[in-house]
UniProtKB/Swiss-Prot annotation:
Organism: Erwinia tasmaniensis (strain DSM 17950 / CFBP 7177 / CIP 109463 / NCPPB 4357 / Et1/99)
Family: Belongs to the GHMP kinase family. IspE subfamily.
Organism phylogeny: Bacteria, Pseudomonadati, Pseudomonadota, Gammaproteobacteria, Enterobacterales
One Gene Ontology biological process: terpenoid biosynthetic process
InterPro entries xref list: GHMP_kinase_C_dom, GHMP_kinase_C_sf, GHMP_kinase_N_dom, IspE, Ribosomal_Su5_D2-typ_SF, Ribsml_uS5_D2-typ_fold_subgr
Record function comment: Catalyzes the phosphorylation of the position 2 hydroxy group of 4-diphosphocytidyl-2C-methyl-D-erythritol.
Subunit structure of this chain's protein: Homodimer.
Catalytic residues as annotated in Swiss-Prot or TrEMBL: 10, 141
HAMAP family: IspE
Record keywords: ATP-binding, Isoprene biosynthesis, Kinase, Nucleotide-binding, Transferase
Protein name as it appears in the record: 4-diphosphocytidyl-2-C-methyl-D-erythritol kinase
GO MF annotation: an example: ATP binding
């Protein structure tokens, strides 16, 4: 049977870097919220013993694609626990709407959707907590997509506390550049010593992203986009970019600004949601 699963985008409503670890990773405080917009995965399980990606990405070998890596990891863990036969296989395809290097979590969301969906379809019986631990091996943002609730995150982003920020409307714009996360985190000018604060203080303060200054300095396209959006609404970078979002109370207000966007800029309008569309789909299975 062929099933279809959402792989939603996320926004970092704020992102603060509170330190750098000896292993090079950074300690963060960030607020994740999902969007009702993203990629779509189509999954067909079978008894072929093979995992096939029917929609390869240009320049990304299948074995490096997070979709295949997630499927292999789940299969290995399930077979280690004797909850899956050796001939378990699947055909997987993704319809991409989220840009690579956009700060929307597209690859991590794809991986999380594979873990959650195949755990259900293969009936491997892992808990969301176990799946999130597997996901952390694939990327720091994978656990929040697996757990499926808007969250305040600490550590490298893996320690999650459920929160319920307002479900606002967002205009998300892409400046036409792709930004690799290591480029930003290795920048010598990046702020790495923002004081750690309690969640109550963070939620009552103005939201910021510590990566934004570095990205705006390095990428003229991002600087111009943020400056333009700030004329209309509170706006900032998500993740390490490149996407920038502006927040609105209504869809119509977001659409009015979108219609004024300079020619050639790509973007979309979506609502923030505190329960992932992936988990809404899972609950309907």
């Amino acid at each position: 049977m062929i099933t279809t699963w959402p792989a939603p985008a996320k926004l970092n409503l704020f992102l603060y870097i509170t330190g750098r670890r000896p292993d090079g990773y950074h300690d963060l405080q960030t607020l994740f919220q999902f969007l009702d917009y993203g990629d779509t995965l189509t999954i067909e399980t079978n008894q072929s013993g093979t995992l096939r990606l029917l929609s390869p990405l240009d320049g990304v070998p299948d074995d490096d694609n997070l979709i295949i890596r997630a499927a292999k990891l789940l299969r290995e863990q399930a077979q280690k626990h004797s909850t899956l036969p050796a001939n378990a296989g699947a055909n997987l395809a993704v319809t991409k709407r989220l840009p690579m290097g956009g700060g929307l979590g597209g690859g991590s969301s794809n991986a999380a959707t594979v873990l959650v969906a195949l755990n259900h379809l293969w009936q491997t019986g892992f808990s969301l907590h176990q799946l999130a631990a597997f996901g952390l091996q694939l990327g720091a943002d994978v656990p929040v997509f697996v757990q499926g609730f808007a969250a305040f995150a600490e550590g490298v982003g893996e320690r999650l506390m459920p929160v319920s920020p307002p479900e606002k409307w967002y205009l998300v714009m892409h400046p036409g550049v792709s930004i690799a996360t290591p480029l930003v985190f290795n920048d010598p000018l990046l702020t790495r010593n923002t004081p750690r604060r309690e969640i109550s203080a963070l939620l009552s303060a103005e939201f910021r992203n510590d990566c934004e200054a570095v990205v705006r300095n390095r990428f003229r396209e991002v600087e111009q986009l943020v400056s333009w959006l700030l004329e209309y609404a509170p706006s900032r970078l998500t993740g390490t970019g490149a996407c920038v979002f502006a927040e609105f109370d209504t869809e119509s207000a977001a659409r009015q600004v979108f219609e004024l966007a300079p020619a050639g800029l790509q973007g979309f309008i979506a609502q923030g949601v505190n329960i992932s569309p992936l988990h809404r789909t899972l609950s309907e299975q």
